[in-house]
Amino acid sequence: MRERPRLGEDSSLISLFLQVVAFLAMVMGTHTYSHWPSCCPSKGQDTSEELLRWSTVPVPPLEPARPNRHPESCRASEDGPLNSRAISPWRYELDRDLNRLPQDLYHARCLCPHCVSLQTGSHMDPRGNSELLYHNQTVFYRRPCHGEKGTHKGYCLERRLYRVSLACVCVRPRVMG
C-alpha cells in the first residue's frame, strides 16, 4: 500500500511543476518574427548582416555538466538552475547553423534514463522515465535569391519549423500489451 505524500513533499512537487510551466511559457512565448520580407537586399547592406546575428531565442547559461556515464550517480541538486534541480535533470547543447535565423539554438539532453527519487534526491526511481519535451520553433534558412538572367542578388529567408528539445520531464513508463 502506498503512502500519501506529506504536505512538504506535495508542495515541493507543486513548486517544481509551477517552475517548469513558467520556464516553458517563457521559452514557447518567444517565437521569431514571421513578417520579415521573403527576399532581403544584397549581403553588403548592414540590415541583412544585423538580422543574421540577431537571435530571438533566450540563451540559457551553458552548464559545464557532462552526461552521466554512470546512471546510478544521477542526482538532483538542492540549489542552482532549474535544469539541475529537476527530478529529470538535463543540460543544454548548442546547435549552431550560420545559414539559419536564429543561428544558435540550445537543445536539452537528459542526464539520467530514469527520474531521480524525490525522497533521496540521488537514487533513480525506475517507476519513472526521463524524456525530452519538444517544441516546434519557427526558424528561417538563408537561401540564394535569383536575380535577372540567373544571377544571385542577395538571399531569401525560407520559413520552417524546427524541433527543439526544451527540457526533460519525468513520465510513467509506457506499458505495451
Swiss-Prot record:
Example GO BP: response to nematode
Alphabetical UniProt keywords: Cytokine, Disulfide bond, Glycoprotein, Secreted, Signal
Carbohydrate-modified residues: N136
The protein's name: Interleukin-25
Keyword S-adenosyl-L-methionine: no
Tissues of expression: Expressed at low levels in several tissues, including brain, kidney, lung, prostate, testis, spinal cord, adrenal gland, and trachea.
Disulfide feature: C110-C168, C115-C170
Gene name in the database record: IL25
Subcellular location: Secreted
Organism annotation: Homo sapiens
Keyword Glycoprotein: yes
Biased composition (Basic and acidic residues): 69-78
Leader peptide range in chain numbering: 1-32
Residues covered by region (Disordered): 58-81
GO CC annotation: extracellular region; extracellular space
Function according to Swiss-Prot or TrEMBL: Cytokine produced by various cells such as eosinophils, T-helper type 2 (Th2) cells or epithelial cells that plays a role in internal safety of adaptive immune responses by regulating cytokine production. Promotes and augments T-helper type 2 responses locally or systemically. Exerts its activity via its receptor composed of IL17RA and IL17RB for signal transduction. In turn, stimulates the JAK2-STAT5A pathway and promotes the secretion of type-2 associated cytokines including IL4, IL9 and IL13.
Sequence similarity: Belongs to the IL-17 family.
GO molecular function: cytokine activity; interleukin-17E receptor binding
